[in-house]
Amino acid sequence: MQSRILDIHGNPFRFEADMQTESESRLMPLQYHYSDHPASGLTPAKAARILRAAEQGDLVAQAELAEDMEEKDTHILSELSKRRGAITAVDWQIKPPRNATPEEQRDAEMLQEILEDAVWLDDCIFDATDAILKGFSSQEIEWEQGLVGGLKLIKNVHWRDPAWFMTPAYQRNSLRLRDGTPEGAEMQQFGWVKHVARAKTGYLSRIGLVRTLVWPFIFKNYSVRDFAEFLEIYGLPLRLGKYPEGATDKEKQTLLRAVMSIGHNAGGIIPRGMELEFEKAADGSDSTFMAMIEWAEKSASKAILGGTLTSQADGATSTNALGNVHNDVRLEIRNADLKRLAATLTRDLVYPLYALNCKSFNDARRIPRFEFDVAESEDLNAFADGLNKLVDIGFRIPKQWAHDKLQVPIATENEEVLAKSFQNPTAYMHSKADGKMAVLSVQPDPEDLLDNLEPTAEDYQAVIDPLLKPVVEALQKGGYEFAQEKLAILYAEMNDEELETLLTRAIFVSDLLGRANAKR
């Protein structure tokens, strides 16, 4: 099936429904590519050669090295799984363009239904996060050969090995399929989901985490190997065989076999005149090896998740407050990942479906957007109480904004909604009469309302006392120097949210009082 359509940049192209890697004979050899597993016998020198080759456009070894690292290092796999799993767990929706027409709104709703029914979408989102380690992830779109219900739909999306790709020397940010030529084969429009995840600034071949993680991976494996050798001899007595002068080679071999086997068999024979002695067991400590392994794993955690306290706690420096700080950092990384991924899915999934199926399509700049819901819902009680007070003093607050803040959808016209419950009929009658009584009621003085909002000295004292209590206890326990040493940890554990709320209220009230007095 062929038809002429516009790409997302507004350029016309001929749409091909067949998958590129299966329809073009020059790309068929890619199907028979198998990994050389470059992590086997990996040294710093070999790693440097692999990274240098990637910089020059040959991404094969670097992509295969990333696969090996993920398979061989359980810590790297664990940390990547946390970051990738955090992305796949977030809800999403299709948003229409700004100031959408009724037709654009209907098309956005149709795309939402199409993608909600797509059984391949969850795997597509997960496979796209493979770019976190390797810098990029490419998945090939398989279109339905005919129309389904009058629509051109995606049948499946297939992950493709990163080793299938290259970057040409003259376009180092352009991903191409390896076809045996120096420039490679361009990827066809509407045929790929191409996601790029930048761990740092640079050309496409240098932005993946693999280039940072390879070094702690190497040094950790050196330490693991040395640690295994240490465990083989640690605690075992030295078995020393002595043979007399003039012993033949055969007698020496007999003694050697006895020495080597007696530790396992607890018995053996040697010729008369030869001796077998047991020296003191080998001493040593595993702390050096474990320190190196711990350093490598913490370095990997910092690179992947931005910290270590969400991965492991040592019981000494780890506190709940510091753990929350590190978790906040991880959430920031997750939200950044989601923002980049949403742009990719809008460009490579939503736009093709929109351009091929929707009547409202006429401009590549006005398209529905794939968006992840990363908004944190507000505390319902605190938010409702604050809104009531703000409305009472004249704030004009849009309903849509309040619904978005609380993540409560607005009911459609025919949907049932919750109704306010009343304790007694009198309260119900009063609620019905509120609208009629409003014109007769006396409006309260704005300054009286503001005075009720302003925190009192007792409010401040009730909040500050718990904050200072650990510091006072530290001073009483160990004096000034002890308290000074503990201050950093104590500060991280302080929960100053209530104090911030009081100060915010005080500043807000002061500002409004100033404005009210200025008008008088």
Curated annotation (Swiss-Prot):
It holds the Pfam family Portal_Mu. It comes from the Bacteria. To phage Mu protein gp29. This is Mu-like prophage FluMu protein gp29.
